[in-house]
Amino acid sequence: MSRVCELTGAKANNGMAVSHSHIRTKKLQQVNLQKRRLWWEEGKKWVNIKISTKALKSIQKVGLDKFAKSNGVDLNKF
């Protein structure tokens, strides 16, 4: 099971951890993914989806259907 947002496609970022003595080591910054059961009004059904918290915040603002269409995601596959 990959750690990728199913709506936005957001995935892990490669970064650096920098110590006090400025020694840099590679670090993986994971996306904050949550499994959510959202009501899809147009389809009149519940949708189980794994999304990032950033996407969840956007869905609360614009709505699930509009957000999915803007990202080119078909909600019928969930």
From Swiss-Prot:
One of its GO terms (cellular component) is ribosome. InterPro entries: Ribosomal_bL28, Ribosomal_bL28/bL31-like_sf, Ribosomal_bL28_bact-type, Ribosomal_bL28_sf. It holds the Pfam family Ribosomal_L28. Gene3D superfamilies: Ribosomal protein L28/L24. It comes from the Bacteria. Keywords: Ribonucleoprotein, Ribosomal protein. GO terms for molecular function: structural constituent of ribosome. Coiled coil: none annotated. GO terms for biological process: translation. Belongs to the bacterial ribosomal protein bL28 family. HAMAP family: Ribosomal_bL28. This is Large ribosomal subunit protein bL28. It comes from Prochlorococcus marinus (strain MIT 9301).
